[in-house]
Amino acid sequence: MASRYEKEDSKRRILSACVQLFLEKGYQKTTTVEILKKADVTPSTFYNIYHTKGSILTELTEFMFGNQFNISGKIVGEETNPVLLYAVETCLQLTLAELNENLREIYVEAYTVPENIELIHKKTTVQLQKIFAPYLPGYSASDFYEMEIGTAAFMRGYMARPCDMYFTLERKLARFLSMSLSVFKVPQEEQEAILSYIENLNIREIANKVMQQLFVTLEMKYEFTLTN
């Protein structure tokens, strides 16, 4: 029993150390040596629980994405048009990546590491089928899975490319939505209404509040305090 509790305690400390380091330094700049030191665990303990940093990223990704959907629902209301909820959630994710470079790196890595992106594909496919099935009658789960692979590539590419004076955040959000909603055969009139709704949101202010709330939630979940 003692060894099981010790393993759980080591896992908790590793997660706490990694999440804090990822947020403060970035995923790529966080070394295994730093994780071991901060978590106060041996290399054998670390590799027995997590084989790579990517394995830790998988747990973090699952938690972060779950929180995003909950927050988006609170912004537009749980009973709203599900397509609008999808638009708000994806636009918030793109905006969060613009507000914080370490978050951008976490998101981009999440869409790159094989086990992570597969988790995203599977979870998002379920959501996409619920949201867009009325527009695509007769489409199966495998059809939505294949479409998710494509729209996830849109998301990764747009998150990885920082905005500038020409490719502004507003243009990025509008282009992403027009591309993804077209994939799911959302009528043009409805697309325009959704784009208008997003344009009238103060998306930067909302995303900043979401980011601060996310940081507080992560601190509570993984028991650490950010230093910056």
Q: What are these model-derived regions, one by one?
A:
Residues 59, 70-103, 113, 121-125:
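Hydrophobic alpha-helical connector segments
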